[in-house]
Amino acid sequence: MSLSKETEVIFDEHRGVDYDSANPPLYDSSTFHQKVLGGNAKFDYARSGNPNRQLLEEKLAKLEGGQYAFAYASGIAAISAVLLTLKANDHVILPDDVYGGTFRLTEQILNRFDIQFTTVNATQPKEIERAIQPNTKLIYVETPSNPCFKITDIRAVAAIAKRHHLLLAVDNTFMTPLGQSPLALGADIVVHSATKFLGGHSDIIAGAAITNRKDVADALYLLQNGTGTALSAHDSWTLAKHLKTLPVRFKQSTSNAEKLVAFLKEREEIAEVYYPGNSSLHLSQANSGGAVIGFRLKDETKTQDFVDALTLPLVSVSLGGVETILSHPATMSHAAVPEDVRNERGITFGLFRLSVGLEQPQELIADLNYALKEAFNESIIESITEQRFSS
């Protein structure tokens, strides 16, 4: 029977075979008994394999429509694994507004190993193709990008990659496997910061890489095992449980985000609102606008005043939790990017990223409304309580 993704995250094919409990047991063990010396047992040492991680990886593979999945100790560990499948003098093409952690990884760490990187405007497939060199091996994109929500045409870039015999990796963190399926669009590898929507509760750090290619899978497993970056049994067990509620969480957060987008578009204090659901290209390759919004204040000198006046959002790094999280990319996710480069890429001091959670949307709107008025010195007539939380 072919199952929907919504059912797949709940159904456990090991139940009734390996155990009878509603949830799989936690195999909190570093090592496993070997009945036969040299007998090639399924599990021997937890870094190499664990039943909880195996179950999680099976679910992640099915969600992304892949044959192989690998769970890592963080999103950046998964990205590192993908890039470390390359060797010295190989060349990679990246978006010019790539996530700050990926920027730091490429600029300060991997360049020591003579892996070469070129950044381009990934919204223009022709620019990507022009950047290809004889030693290019990989095109790596984020779509939507973080934090300016630029959209890359996955089908077009996949066609370029195949024409030049290159690999294409797509960071699908913002959209989740429920909102976008890069492998089905022609990508070779999908990566996630599973800390975000897949985990959804801001209580674990995790990453994932999924592929249909056996050669890539072998390389990813070698790195997972050989560099010791595998996700722990406990975090694998926790993440597998959290995946069960991903469909309802992502659907509700997206619905809430759409309401906040409509509100922010009407505010005169806001210079720009960024939302993937406003892009026809995005909607041609995804079935959802997602639950993350970008917006820019008209007067960036009001940035701290705006933050000070907010009550409901968690002001923090990260995204994809059940709680609404307001992030300031210039001082958080992209702090590792030099200021002049940030400004050139539109990551200015007045830019915010809002990951919308499961709170009542009208209460979030009321809180944002109050904070904008307070920051921009508009008169407050109603009491704070009434203005923030009246329906």
From Swiss-Prot:
UniProt keyword Lyase present: yes
InterPro entries assigned to the protein according to its UniProt record, in alphabetical order: Cys/Met-Metab_PyrdxlP-dep_enz (IPR000277), Cys_met_metab_PP (IPR054542), PyrdxlP-dep_Trfase (IPR015424), PyrdxlP-dep_Trfase_major (IPR015421), PyrdxlP-dep_Trfase_small (IPR015422), Trans-sulfuration_enzyme (IPR053577)
EC number: 4.4.1.13
UniProtKB keywords: Amino-acid biosynthesis, Lyase, Methionine biosynthesis, Pyridoxal phosphate
CDD domains: CGS_like (cd00614)
pH profile: Optimum pH is 8.5.
One annotated Gene Ontology cellular component of this protein: cytoplasm
Superkingdom as given in the UniProt entry: Bacteria
Pathway entry: Amino-acid biosynthesis; L-methionine biosynthesis via de novo pathway; L-homocysteine from L-cystathionine: step 1/1
Cofactor section: pyridoxal 5'-phosphate
Modified residues (N6-(pyridoxal phosphate)lysine): K196
Catalytic activity: L,L-cystathionine + H2O = L-homocysteine + pyruvate + NH4(+); an S-substituted L-cysteine + H2O = a thiol + pyruvate + NH4(+)
GO biological process, one term: methionine biosynthetic process
Single GO MF annotation: cysteine-S-conjugate beta-lyase activity
Reported temperature dependence: Optimum temperature is 37 degrees Celsius.
Activity control summary: Cystathionine beta-lyase activity is inhibited by sweat components such as glycine, serine and ammonium sulfate. Inhibited by cystathionine at a concentration higher than 6 mM.
Pfam families listed in its UniProt record: Cys_Met_Meta_PP (PF01053)
Description of how the protein assembles with itself and partners: Homotetramer.
Family membership noted in the UniProt record: Belongs to the trans-sulfuration enzymes family.
Function of the protein: Catalyzes the transformation of cystathionine into homocysteine. Can also catalyze, at low levels, the conversion of cystathionine into methionine and the conversion of methionine into methanethiol.
Name of the protein in question: Cystathionine beta-lyase MetC
Protein's organism: Staphylococcus haemolyticus (strain JCSC1435)
Highest classification ranks of the organism: Bacteria, Bacillati, Bacillota, Bacilli, Bacillales
